[in-house]
Amino acid sequence: MKLSILEAAALTAASVASAQDDLAYSPPYYPSPWADGHGEWSNAYKRAVDIVSQMTLTEKVNLTTGTGWELERCVGQTGSVPRLGIPSLCLQDSPLGIRMSDYNSAFPAGINVAATWDKTLAYQRGKAMGEEFSDKGIDVQLGPAAGPLGRSPDGGRNWEGFSPDPALTGVLFAETIKGIQDAGVIATAKHYILNEQEHFRQVGEAQGYGFNITETVSSNVDDKTMHELYLWPFADAVRAGVGAVMCSYNQINNSYGCQNSLTLNKLLKAELGFQGFVMSDWSAHHSGVGAALAGLDMSMPGDISFDSGTSFYGTNLTVGVLNGTIPQWRVDDMAVRIMAAYYKVGRDRLWTPPNFSSWTRDEYGFAHFFPSEGAYERVNEFVNVQRDHAQVIRRIGADSVVLLKNDGALPLTGQEKTVGILGEDAGSNPKGANGCSDRGCDKGTLAMAWGSGTANFPYLVTPEQAIQNEVLKGRGNVFAVTDNYDTQQIAAVASQSTVSLVFVNADAGEGYLNVDGNMGDRKNLTLWQNGEEVIKTVTEHCNNTVVVIHSVGPVLIDEWYAHPNVTGILWAGLPGQESGNAIADVLYGRVNPGGKTPFTWGKTRASYGDYLLTEPNNGNGAPQDNFNEGVFIDYRRFDKYNETPIYEFGHGLSYTTFELSGLQVQLINGSSYVPTTGQTSAAQTFGKVEDASSYLYPEGLKRISKFIYPWLNSTDLKASTGDPDYGEPNFEYIPEGATDGSPQPRLPASGGPGGNPGLYEDLFQVSVTITNTGKVAGDEVPQLYVSLGGPNEPKRVLRKFERLHLAPGQQKVWTTTLNRRDLANWDVVAQDWKITPYAKTIFVGTSSRKLPLAGRLPRVQ
């Protein structure tokens, strides 16, 4: 196979070198587990087996391999099996809407969903996105994201995910997945795993920025931290039935994420019981044999480098089976996993071809964009897929607003004599809402950050527009200055304003775009575009200054948040197309703010720990990013080091007040945990593998330049691969057990979707009474934290929450449960979850540091 023999040797050599050089090491785990169709996957699995059994080898390979960058209409597209009616599958970004399209919605970012703490809204957003993807003819949505989790507050893509807390992320991750897949589209849980920064994620990208590295960054983590922090939300995703997982660019303990047998074979497929397929991130595929045996099921976009016409899969995967390097059962399993996901979401009933092109807005163009080949046809049908989704977008935008501070300034009455709207972030991008490719600039109001995780706006309501409409209703005066450097005019407007509304922001994004020296990751946590000076100027001239922050995460506010003239602070995140309307709803009291901050607001950057690697530290080899902090990120770190935050995790004010009382705890299940034992079934093969002559290019096929095909040029396998080293001894480099299809031992922590079913048995029922003691209706989020009791554990960790709506004077009893996973730690020796003998205490309140109710749990096992 082309490059694969060399790559297998390199992998072995790298493992030895890693051990010798005392670098982090990822132990091998083989063979790659085969799907068995357990639980809710049963019917889809049976259908997948039936159809795959009818496929030839090259038809199976066609499902596993993208056709190449810009070769079809979508950012990723597989081959098809027309003989059996199986279409080419369209894969398209992003986690917040359809990228590179038109007449689609631009949804709030994942971080805003986290700020709502609302499971229903997470599901509704997922369902609405799924409907739009389906209506555009997209089969696989490349989202949602739980990687990055948010280890470092300045990580460039944190906003695509939810929160640095794994429990909050896991719940909302799962609800989003359910919504997408209930709309008939395969969801993709990404980026798996430890993809926590943009610096050094790709060699070419880093070299373009002047860094002389030859391998991508290695995220080095211990087993306990992996399970208790970063793997946690992916377990929730698997339990929710996610159809696809995208492996990441980075290395994990010096093994690439898309050929790391421990993370793919052991953790994801064996331990968590994942039944869907693993796809590579775009060009994160580094080998043929190595990746296939380590658990990679689909290569995206198919070519080794964009538009190269070469692939680690395609023809080379066909050759790998024919020469015995890759067992037939492994390719059969790849195809079964892909088709099972397809059937599970009902895509076969809803499938339509893509009605748009990612590469042009022209109505007509060549069928194959990059080589300008194939039929000249209608490539864009301009189908409007927005439906009524503006309603849920606006609601999430408003419900995600976090009222950080309110000294009586809010809500506004609408009768203010003069309202000043100050700051570039209130206005429009002079180039238009979509004027910067993939939103790669910070111009005008910030409603989404930058990168492949974006969508085109159908429109963007700015704060200036929405607030002006409000002021004019009350026949007041409204003056706006959206030039952050026009200090004189800002001061003039502020001095005559009854209330000054200051809009500031901080942006970030994906590493292929450099915005103002920010290579994806933020250079610092300060406000952008002179934001601090705008606030300073306004507070010097107006004693009623309300600051609205649109940002990708925390920013430093210590110099001004306590200023007596700052009477209100709101964090509005990245609210999408209805941005202005959403913030106006909150400012004018139509919506009572109920958002809670999904991250901690520290006094300094140092408060968070130095967790972003910005300079190579391993010569020109892979930069080594050591996760020495373990599970202590965000509020867990603040608690450990007794750091006092400005606003703690989970904080958020309301226009009303609430009281929590009456904590009750009941043991509902005292059964003991039973580790999984026994063996899997043997790997199955479906259909026969013929000799090489059966897999030659079909006669009369007109080949498309650079298109990735599964067929052979010749029955001479070496000639078909073009690999000059083909035929050299390579079985000594195949990892031990990698081709073994016999029954395998089951892992103790395995046994069902998301792991051992015993982990999800409810042990305790907890109830609390919440009372609205104020004069207006509002939402409160009771939060349950657990102290696991060990000397090296966080003081407390979030485990349960619920957003509740209460009328004035109304009481509600919130009842939740705690399962075994909620109370357990990962035992690195037993390789299983264990409830330790340390005392377990629960705390219930309205933030991580406002916890008025507490109770000790009886001991369970």
Swiss-Prot record:
Pfam families: Fn3-like, Glyco_hydro_3, Glyco_hydro_3_C. GO terms for molecular function: beta-glucosidase activity. InterPro entries: Cellulose_deg_GH3, Fn3-like, Glyco_hydro_3_AS, Glyco_hydro_3_C, Glyco_hydro_3_C_sf, Glyco_hydro_3_N, Glyco_hydro_3_N_sf, Glycoside_hydrolase_SF. Residues 1-19 form the signal peptide. GO terms for biological process: cellulose catabolic process. Its EC number is 3.2.1.21. Gene3D superfamilies: Glycoside hydrolase family 3 C-terminal domain, Glycoside hydrolase, family 3, N-terminal domain, Immunoglobulins. It catalyses: Hydrolysis of terminal, non-reducing beta-D-glucosyl residues with release of beta-D-glucose. Residues 735-754 are annotated as: Disordered. Beta-glucosidases are one of a number of cellulolytic enzymes involved in the degradation of cellulosic biomass. Catalyzes the last step releasing glucose from the inhibitory cellobiose. Belongs to the glycosyl hydrolase 3 family. PANTHER family: BETA-GLUCOSIDASE, BETA-GLUCOSIDASE A-RELATED. This is Probable beta-glucosidase A.
